[in-house]
């Protein structure tokens, strides 16, 4: 029993694969004192979602590049954009505009530290990505109930075979 407990305690949560340029960028952000949160680590699926819906939503977030994107306060935008060559990443800054039907309907902020500023920033980001049916969405970024998505001018579909494991 103790060995099994120790095994569980030593297990890391699964993490999306990242190219070396992303890992290097995140090390540099830490070195420069630029705070960030990985999107998938601070949200949870709403308990009303089915397993199949959660799978499709997470796959869409991964395909969009949002799942492992870094959430960073807008005050660090210029510093982030002026980082050294050879690093890359995806960022979501917290100064986004809202849409009526959005991801706050299906995702909850995991705010274990009770940080009101973090909660507000993440809620702003979730409310900027539309959710619902394709016909209802007029924003620049959305996910529909089947996992189809749009981010800017790019639209995409999901395999419907993916199994959620990060959120």
Show which residues each predicted segment covers.
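Hinge-like oligomerization/junction regions that interrupt long coiled-coil arms in large cytoskeletal
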Residues: 20-167
């Amino acid at each position: 029993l103790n060995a099994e407990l120790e095994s569980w305690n030593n297990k890391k949560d699964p993490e999306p694969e990242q190219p070396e340029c992303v890992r290097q960028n995140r090390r540099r952000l830490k070195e420069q004192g630029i705070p960030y949160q990985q999107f998938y680590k601070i949200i949870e699926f709403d308990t009303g979602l089915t397993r199949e819906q959660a799978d499709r939503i997470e796959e869409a977030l991964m395909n969009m590049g949002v799942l492992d994107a870094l959430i960073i306060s807008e005050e660090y935008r210029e510093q982030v954009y002026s980082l050294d060559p050879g690093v890359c990443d995806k960022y979501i800054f917290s100064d986004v505009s809202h849409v009526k039907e959005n991801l706050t309907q299906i995702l909850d902020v995991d705010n274990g530290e009770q940080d009101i500023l973090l909660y507000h920033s993440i809620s702003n980001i979730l409310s900027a990505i539309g959710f619902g049916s394709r016909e209802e969405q007029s924003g620049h970024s959305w996910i529909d109930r089947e996992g189809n998505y749009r981010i800017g001018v790019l639209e995409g579909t999901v395999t419907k075979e993916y199994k959620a494991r990060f959120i």
